[in-house]
Amino acid sequence: MATGELALVSSLFIVVVFLLLGAVAREASALTRHDFPEGFVFGAGSSAFQVEGAAAEDGRKPSIWDTFINQGYMPDGSNADVSADQYHHYKEDVKLMYDMGLDAYRFSIAWPRLIPDGRGEINPKGLEYYNNLIDELIMHGIQPHVTIYHFDLPQALQDEYGGILSPRFIEDYSAYAEVCFKNFGDRVKHWATFNQPNIEPIGGFDAGDRPPRRCSYPFGTNCTGGDSSTEPYIVAHHLLLAHASAVSIYRQKYQAIQGGQIGITLMVRWHEPYTDKTADAAAAIRMNEFHIGWFLHPLVHGDYPPVMRSRVGVRLPSITASDSEKIRGSFDFIGINHYYVIFVQSIDANEQKLRDYYIDAGVQGEDDTENIQCHSWSLGKVLNHLKLEYGNPPVMIHENGYSDSPDIFGKINYNDDFRSAFLQGYLEALYLSVRNGSNTRGYFVWSMFDMFEFLYGYRLRFGLCGVDFTAAARTRYLKNSARWYSGFLRGGELRPEKSYATL
């Protein structure tokens, strides 16, 4: 080798060594928000039914969740009639967000507040409230990220035609979504059509432990009717078509003028095999297809996953060629809500005469929301899965959080350092995923405030900010995690000696 060539190789070797050392040093140093790409959004979230209160004020009418609660189906007997009462405290709440340094606030619009009967007249008081909230956020430099539907279907539509189980839902939802675009889209630039449409069909129409309480034996009991083997798939199909319809309206009539983006938010749990058996490994892959691919596969490829087609058969609705064209690509981003891993085992579906979603998937596993474990590596697996299987779509992490122990029910609790540790682990895992090519563009903590939690009432509290539910004024207070997150948002370091990314 000539002297010049040797010198060139030596120089290149030194450069490579420095780059590698820099990468190692970067992993060992403290992480700050400035290590994320420019424009990366950090925020926190809520939903209308859970945080607003004012359940019977200013023209709002009941949702299916109001009915569910009033009929006595909440295990702890609680309700969301007042909850954190953001309806009356939104200015105070936005000031808290501003003081903490949030880039964005994710919230939902209550369909029964904006259009109380589900269709027809707009409630002027509802319109006023959301305009005021959006304006207050923008005045404080906080982006509004709006979910159009977060489980709170107007009871009027459930009574009239069975709600989401009927294809009539698609037209009514589309009209409601257009009201939102028309009235708020000049200021709202980030829309999600649905929150967790891959969960509502299971709870409401398979297990029947959520409204409208439809199920069939042996998959649920004490239901109002239903068929657990077919209705979850029908409902999911209607949600998918309603999503595509709303996106089509937005793109054809509003997007070019308003300059916003629209997507959908899915629950994305990660499934791992319970044992090292080949059957359990296959079950985990299959369950990720049933859970994530149920919506993402048609959104990206235009049809349901092949494994669902083969295992569900004729009970899985067909996607017509015209519907496939509307559904495929009907997103500018994918929102994901991720909390934990479920370890699953394979079961023999052929031995089951009666079938539902989980029998069709051929898996069993434990879903323990009350005891969330920190497996932050799972977020990396989720984001890598989206990158490899679905073309690396733009992603917004719309929910990630940890609940206080039920033992502190009814108490004011500032000390939630484990929440800070939990979030730090996931932020570190998120950073590594972004560095490795994930197209993730935002992260929202669930939740901004303590509030009513679906099925759990006030026993589980996810808030960065606490709420004194014993006080009529619903006094807010900053927990330790709120101060920790605020420090990060303002450029502070996530200390490496307190790293939880491997948990």
UniProtKB/Swiss-Prot annotation:
The answer to whether the entry has keyword Glycoprotein is yes
Is Transmembrane found in the keyword set?
A: no
Any one GO MF term held by the record is:
beta-glucosidase activity
Positions annotated as active site in the UniProt record: 399
Residues that, per the record, bind a beta-D-glucoside:
50, 150, 195-196, 339, 399, 446, 453-454, 462
Q: Which keywords does this chain's UniProt record carry?
A: Disulfide bond, Glycoprotein, Hydrolase, Signal
Swiss-Prot/TrEMBL GO biological process terms: carbohydrate metabolic process
- Does the entry annotate any disulfide bonds, and if so which pairs? 215-223
Glycosylation annotated at which residues? 222, 436
Q: Which residues form the signal peptide?
A: 1-30
Q: Which family does it belong to?
A: Belongs to the glycosyl hydrolase 1 family.
Please give the PANTHER family that the UniProt record associates with this protein.
Answer: GLYCOSYL HYDROLASE, INACTIVE BETA-GLUCOSIDASE 33-RELATED
| Name of the protein this chain belongs to | Probable inactive beta-glucosidase 33
User: Which gene is this protein's source?
Assistant: BGLU33
